[in-house]
Every structure is written in structure tokens, then in C-alpha cells.
Amino acid sequence: MKKLILHEINSLPPLPSSVIELDDYKNTDNIDVEQLIEIIKKDPLMVANILKVANSSMFGFRSKIETLSRAINLLGVKFTVSIAIGSAIQNTIKSNLLAYAVSNQDFIYTSSLATNIINTWISAIDFDLKNELLLPAFLQEVGKFIISEVIQKEKRTEEFLQELNETKDISFCEQKYMGFSCGRITANVFKHWNLSHNIIFPIAYAEDLESCPDSFKQKAQ
């Protein structure tokens, strides 16, 4: 399985230019909303996913959010960037989550929920830490697309689903079938794309804090 995972990761196409632009934008101190809108509008899928999240029951806004600018205003710049990058990465991997019996839209929703928890809880404690954790929180389960692809190619989908139903322990099943945690696979996907250690390390060591470099332990907890 390990060789199959590495093959899937090494076969991934390069990230689209929009993700690189968003990552550069995220790392600037000067937040220009109009510039962000111009970057996101280049990718209709990004726009669609941002609007779906903004109109989801998670937020419960009274009126329908129909424009990107209003969505950014309500969700916040950092949250919006996380959704945009996450949807672009999902589309780049071009896989599905059939092995987990969930849809890609379910993935976007649950990832947004994890990000919203960080956005709500951590911001009251440490605003700077919150901004650093939003993107890792959204992206931490990306490895599931690789796992699902490998499971399907090995024709073990029914077996994997049965194990999930019996154990109710996703992490255990992933480790058993893959030999790696989802976090480790996700981290290796992002290492393949040369993404920042600020994204990779909190995900890679979330379940192995003892091995985590000291400078990243707070982010991985």
C-alpha cells in the first residue's frame, strides 16, 4: 500500500497558479479585498464553493449570499482564502471519497466546520495563532482523497467501508489499510507541492506531538 500511496502522490499535477497567488496573498500584511476577489474570480469552482459555504446552515445568515464580495465580508478574508485554496486542491487531486461513502461537497462542508471552530474558539485566545491554523484546519483531511483512490484501485472499497461501520474508528482503519495516518499522507501531499512548513507540520504531527519540533507543537495540538 505504501508504494501505491507514493505513486498517487508523485502522480499529482502541479498546483494551479491561483493557489500560488492565494498563498502569496495570504502571506502579505496588506489585505486588499479587491485583489483577493480578482484572484478568486479566475476559478469559478472557488467562487461556487465559497458561496455554498456562506449559504450553509453552519452560519445561518438571514438572507442569501449571492456575491463574492459579500461572502468575503461575512466570512472574513482568512476564512475565505482557506476555502478557496481547499477547493482548488480538491479539484487538482481529481478523486472522490467513495471509499468513505461521502461526497466531495460533504468534504468541503466538514472542512469548513473545522475551520469555523478554529475561527471562533482560538480567536478569543490568540488571534495570530488562529490565522496560522485556519488553513491547516481546512486542509488536514485532504489525504483522504489519496486513501480513497488507493482503496478503490485495489478493489477493497466494500471491505474498507465494512471495517469503518464495524469499528466506528476512521483513524484506526486508515492506519490499518494504509500503514500511515491520514495526517501523514496529507503532509506528504503538501510536501510534494512544496507548501509551507506552517501548513505541513501542524497536520503531520497532530497525532504524534512527541516527535513534533518544539516550534510547531502549539500549532499541532
Where are the regions a protein language model picked out?
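Conserved alpha-helical "signature site"
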Residues: M1-K153, I170-L195, I203-K219
